[in-house]
Amino acid sequence: MSVKIENIRSELLSKNWFKLHKYTFDLIDDNGTSVQQIREVYDRGNGATILLYNRPNGTVLLINQFRMPTYVNGNPDGMLLETCAGLLDNDSPEECIRREAMEETGYQVDSVQKLFEAYMSPGGVTEIIHFFAAEYHADQKVTDDVGVEDEVIEVVELPFTEAIAMIADGRIKDGKTIMLLQYAQIHGLLK
């Protein structure tokens, strides 16, 4: 099936932190049937995330961070256990994720492996996330001062097997983190 889009009109609804647009357009299917659709689209830019793992120790490095949207949606304290991540801004995905790893974990990682890209919520958000993995070792830790601006972050080192179990029991609920941990499990990054 293929579709054709015509008569696209955009209205800016908000440009506070990110941009929220209302799009009105005609969607035409293979049979030539045209249906007018209206969608709100949130443009927050693209991002990157990374799974930091230590193969000899069988551990992963995650962060516990306050996320207001999770609090609003029933997470009692708003804290979310996740892989470090950030928006690209004007950096390449590789530059972004090295910077974010340093800012959020205190580890300086040089060699990062790009795994894949994914839309995380394509029904309403434009963002593509670039997924990475990298090994970390104790000698790469350069600071205990983590987080920037008003971020509330705790660095958490866990056995990989425990992190996998935390998906099943609901202690890890972040989609990008689940995807990276399962990628590591499927591809044998840690034994």
From Swiss-Prot:
Enzyme Commission designation: 3.6.1.-
Annotated GDP-alpha-D-mannose binding sites? 38-40, 67, 85-87, 104, 127, 150-151, 176
Q: Where does Mg(2+) 2 bind?
A: 100, 104, 151
- Could you say which residues bind Mg(2+) 1 here? 85, 104
What does the UniProt keyword field contain? Hydrolase, Magnesium, Metal-binding
Q: Where is this motif: Nudix box?
A: 86-106
Could you say which cofactors this protein requires? Mg(2+)
UniProt-listed Gene3D superfamilies: Nucleoside Triphosphate Pyrophosphohydrolase
Which reaction is this enzyme known to catalyze?
GDP-alpha-D-mannose + H2O = alpha-D-mannose 1-phosphate + GMP + 2 H(+)
GO terms for MF: hydrolase activity, acting on acid anhydrides, in phosphorus-containing anhydrides; metal ion binding
Q: What does this protein do?
A: Nucleoside diphosphate sugar hydrolase that hydrolyzes GDP-mannose as its preferred substrate, yielding GMP and mannose-1-phosphate.
Question: What is the name attached to this protein's record?
Answer: GDP-mannose pyrophosphatase
What species was this sequence derived from?
Yersinia enterocolitica serotype O:8 / biotype 1B (strain NCTC 13174 / 8081)
Q: What is the lineage of its organism?
A: Bacteria, Pseudomonadati, Pseudomonadota, Gammaproteobacteria, Enterobacterales
